[in-house]
Every structure is written in structure tokens, then in C-alpha cells.
């Protein structure tokens, strides 16, 4: 999330949102991942503070949740945005948010969840075009199973296996270390919390352990991590049998 690196520098999220609205995308609609730290704080507390900037923006700001229960997050977001920004009523009598704001969820949307979201919005008198729904790795990589006569979907994504690639470290103009991390409060499965700063992996009696929160120089000492991809090129290629040996302690 772009919010993580900005938070590490600015100490808040509102500065970056203003920058996105007025400098980066002043004449375009864009979606903004909003759950890097505290999604509902951003929706309920930060958005009202920049209401004028959002309404003056030449485009639509789409508030994107990316953790928690998608059905609850999407529908509750629409309700909160209506309280803050208001809107109009269409010809069928359904509420439509101000065109400068909308809710979006880019992943974890199955057909069943989509139907649930639309059903709840209709129940509370909101038009379904208040939300945008996407299809991503969750939707494409779920295994469908039957349990107790009902269909269940088991996700197998990068978050399931903890292999998502996230930036965790940067340096300022004067070389000062900047620790980047994300820790969404809405992440009920604890899949998305990232390490902070540079990391060191070391061998233990049980396998491997790690230490984070390090500077670049500190992470170079006794580190089992090896660079395999840098500046668009492979620097080292591991065979599958090598990966298995590392994983299982050389056996």
C-alpha cells in the first residue's frame, strides 16, 4: 500500500490522501487502499476532515478495503460515506452517493459475496452502483468444496502462504532509515501484517528464525537471506531440490 511508505515519512495518512487528490490524480478517478493501519478510523475520522478536498476533486475517490469480512466492510462503508457525503435518490427510489466518492473491494469477491453485498444494499435502500467489485487472486484461486450440504470456498493465495512481496525499508535523502510496515486492524486472519524494516534470517535448532526492524547495514550481518532478483535481473537461481533441502533442514 502506498499509504505505508507515506505514513512512515509523514507520520499520518491524511497528508498522502491530500497529495493524491491534488497533485497525483487531480483530474482522474482512483481507488485507494485504506486498510494499512485502521480502516474505520480513516473512514469515520479522516475522510470528514478532507470532505471539501474530496468534493472539489475532479474525479471519484474510491475507498478500498482489503481485509476483514468483504460483505461487512463494503456495505458498512457505503452507509458511512452516505452519512458523511450524502447523495441523491435515483428514479427507482434508491440512494446514490455523491459522485465524488464510492466504495470498492478489489479481491475476495465470490459470486455469493457479491449477491450478499447487493442484497444488503437493496435492503437498506442503496443502489448497487455505489460499489465497484473486482476479481483477483482470491476469486480465481479458491477451491470449491461441499460441507454439510453447503458450498464452501477455501482460498489459496499469496496471503494464505505468507509469500506476498511488500516493501519494508527505505532511506531518506540523507540516508536516514525509514521503517515501512502495514498492520491492518481489520485483518481478522492476521495474514497481512508485514515485517518492519530490513530483516535478518538465521538458523536455529528448530529451523530458521528472523529479526526485523533493522537498518540495511545491520541486516547484512550473519544473514541467511540471499539476493535472487535485483534491478530486473536474476542474481541467483535456486533449483526446486535446493528449496526443498533448505525447507527441510538439508534432508
Task: Please state what every model-predicted region is.
Residues 25-31, 53-55, 93, 170-172, ...:
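Domain-wide signal for the mature, well-folded portions of proteins, strongly enriched
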Residues 1-91, 109-116:
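Buried, small/hydrophobic-residue-enriched core segments of structured protein domains
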Residues 41-43, 143-144, 237-238:
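Short helix/loop capping segments that flank catalytic or ligand/cofactor-binding pockets
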Residues 152-205:
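An anionic, glycine-rich sequence signature occurring as long contiguous blocks
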Residues 61, 66-175:
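C-terminal active-site-proximal or functional interface alpha/beta core segments in diverse enzymes
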Residues 56-60, 94-98, 225-229:
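Short acidic (Asp/Glu) and glycine-rich catalytic loops that position anionic groups and cofactors
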Residues 183-251:
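Extended hydrophobic packing segments that form well-structured cores
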Amino acid at each position: 500500500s502506498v499509504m505505508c511508505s507515506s505514513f512512515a515519512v509523514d507520520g499520518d495518512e491524511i497528508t498522502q490522501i491530500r497529495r493524491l487528490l491534488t497533485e497525483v490524480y487531480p483530474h482522474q478517478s482512483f481507488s485507494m487502499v485504506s486498510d494499512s493501519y485502521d480502516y474505520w478510523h480513516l473512514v469515520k475520522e479522516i475522510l470528514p476532515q478532507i470532505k471539501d478536498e474530496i468534493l472539489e476533486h475532479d474525479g471519484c475517490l474510491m475507498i478500498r478495503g482489503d481485509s476483514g469480512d468483504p460483505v461487512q466492510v463494503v456495505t458498512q462503508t457505503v452507509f458511512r460515506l452516505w452519512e458523511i457525503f450524502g447523495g441523491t435518490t435515483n428514479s427507482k427510489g434508491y440512494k446514490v452517493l455523491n459522485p465524488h466518492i464510492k466504495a470498492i473491494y478489489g479481491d475476495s469477491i465470490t459470486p455469493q459475496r457479491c449477491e450478499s453485498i447487493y442484497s444488503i444494499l437493496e435492503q437498506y435502500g442503496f443502489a448497487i452502483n455505489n460499489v465497484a467489485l473486482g476479481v483477483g487472486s482470491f476469486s480465481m484461486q479458491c477451491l470449491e468444496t461441499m460441507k454439510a450440504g453447503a458450498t464452501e470456498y477455501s482460498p489459496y493465495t499469496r496471503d494464505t502462504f505468507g509469500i506476498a512481496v511488500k516493501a519494508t525499508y527505505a532511506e531518506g535523502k540523507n540516508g536516514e532509515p525509514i521503517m515501512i510496515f502495514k498492520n491492518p486492524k481489520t485483518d481478522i486472519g492476521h495474514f497481512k501484517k508485514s515485517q518492519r524494516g530490513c530483516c535478518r534470517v538465521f538458523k536455529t535448532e528448530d529451523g530458521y528464525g528472523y529479526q526485523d526492524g533493522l537498518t540495511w547495514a545491520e541486516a547484512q550481518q550473519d544473514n541467511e537471506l540471499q539476493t535472487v532478483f535485483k534491478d530486473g535481473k536474476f542474481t541467483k537461481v535456486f533449483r526446486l531440490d535446493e528449496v526443498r533441502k533448505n525447507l527441510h533442514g538439508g534432508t
